[in-house]
């Protein structure tokens, strides 16, 4: 219990402390820029980083538990195949379990839409789950993915700015040979080391995350694609078709389209932490993370694979009944 509390609060306290500490040190130690310029830049960058950090946590990834029609009435009936998922799952979900049945979570007792996964750390299912991030002690998914990408970008820019300023300040200190008359500012040196580490780490992770966004792929899907391709190859063998060229079904055909569906199409949506998804008055479940736009050709192949698996399961479950007649 105590360890759980520490694991929940410590990352948040540490993350905020590092941003505020480095910001305060740069406030008081940097004098190579006009003070007002330095203050405005530091406040702007650190504020964006802190705001998106807490927005990621407050908004959350989104969970299928919020939709009552996805609730399973009886796990036993689902396991016995006497309870079926709602039509929205049957009509829109592409991925099924290896035995051909629709995906569900026994822990949450919920039908799982495509891209939904259960987090063992949070003990909860999340929509379009990307990963569980220990720095937030929460999951990144459908609703907060945009803010997570922005947080990484803001933090990268902030880290690079702090690195540039502290490097220039330290260079000026050595160049003026102040080491002959005074000690090196330990706080400034610590902030420089932290900014080096943070700049490298956040830049690498930001690049990787944006790359996944342009592919319309989550971190989990990146690792699961091998299993999915294996299942499609089995289906391809059954119909004498080569499935080696099948793409990610959620790839919208261009990197810009994939990027815009997460980050928004306008510069304001891209640069500012504002919501980009509008409700569809004709479909209350659109843009809710329950289902996603797909490539028509790839979708057809996936659906044929699902239908084949469903027919095989139906045939196998009917055989014992026929044999007992």
Curated annotation (Swiss-Prot):
Positions of the DHHC domain: 103-153
UniProt PTM: Autopalmitoylated.
Keywords of the record: Acyltransferase, Lipoprotein, Membrane, Palmitate, Transferase, Transmembrane, Transmembrane helix, Vacuole
Pfam families: DHHC
Protein localization: Vacuole membrane
InterPro entries: Palmitoyltrfase_DHHC (IPR001594), PFA4/ZDH16/20/ERF2-like (IPR039859)
Keyword Nucleotide-binding included in the entry's annotation: no
Reaction catalysed by this enzyme: L-cysteinyl-[protein] + hexadecanoyl-CoA = S-hexadecanoyl-L-cysteinyl-[protein] + CoA
GO cellular component, one term: vacuolar membrane
Membrane topology, Lumenal segments: 27-35, 168-185
Domain notes from UniProt: The DHHC domain is required for palmitoyltransferase activity.
PANTHER family in alphabetical order: PALMITOYLTRANSFERASE ZDHHC16
Function, in words: Palmitoyltransferase specific for VAC8. Palmitoylates VAC8 at one or more of its N-terminal cysteine residues, which is required for its proper membrane localization.
Name of this protein: Palmitoyltransferase PFA3
Source organism of the structure: Kluyveromyces lactis (strain ATCC 8585 / CBS 2359 / DSM 70799 / NBRC 1267 / NRRL Y-1140 / WM37)
Gene that encodes it: PFA3
């Amino acid at each position: 219990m105590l360890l759980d509390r520490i694991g929940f609060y410590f990352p948040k306290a540490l993350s905020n402390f590092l941003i505020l500490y480095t910001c305060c040190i740069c406030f008081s130690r940097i004098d190579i820029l006009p003070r007002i310029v330095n203050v405005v830049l530091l406040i702007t960058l650190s504020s964006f980083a802190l705001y998106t950090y807490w927005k990621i946590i407050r908004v959350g990834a989104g969970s299928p538990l919020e939709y009552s029609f996805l609730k399973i009435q009886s796990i036993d009936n689902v396991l016995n195949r006497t309870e079926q998922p709602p039509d929205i799952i049957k009509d829109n979900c592409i991925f099924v379990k290896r035995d051909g049945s629709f995906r569900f979570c026994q822990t949450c007792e919920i039908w799982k839409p495509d891209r939904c996964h259960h987090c063992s750390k949070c003990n909860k299912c999340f929509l379009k789950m990307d990963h569980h991030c220990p720095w937030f002690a929460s999951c990144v998914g459908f609703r907060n993915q945009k803010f997570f990408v922005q947080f990484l970008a803001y933090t990268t820019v902030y880290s690079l700015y702090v690195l540039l300023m502290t490097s220039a300040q330290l260079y000026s200190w050595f160049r003026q040979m102040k080491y002959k008359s005074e000690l090196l500012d330990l706080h400034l040196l610590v902030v420089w080391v932290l900014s080096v580490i943070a700049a490298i780490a956040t830049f690498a992770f930001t690049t990787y995350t944006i790359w996944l966004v342009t592919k319309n792929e989550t971190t989990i899907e990146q690792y699961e694609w091998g299993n999915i391709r294996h299942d499609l190859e089995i289906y391809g063998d059954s119909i004498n078709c080569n499935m080696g060229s099948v793409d990610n079904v959620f790839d919208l055909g261009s990197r810009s389209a994939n990027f815009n569906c997460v980050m928004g199409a306008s510069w304001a949506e891209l640069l500012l932490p504002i919501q980009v998804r509008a409700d569809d008055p004709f479909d209350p479940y659109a843009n809710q993370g329950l289902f996603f736009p797909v490539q028509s050709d790839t979708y057809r192949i996936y659906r044929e694979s699902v239908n084949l698996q469903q027919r095989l399961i139906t045939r196998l479950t009917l055989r014992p009944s026929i044999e007992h007649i």
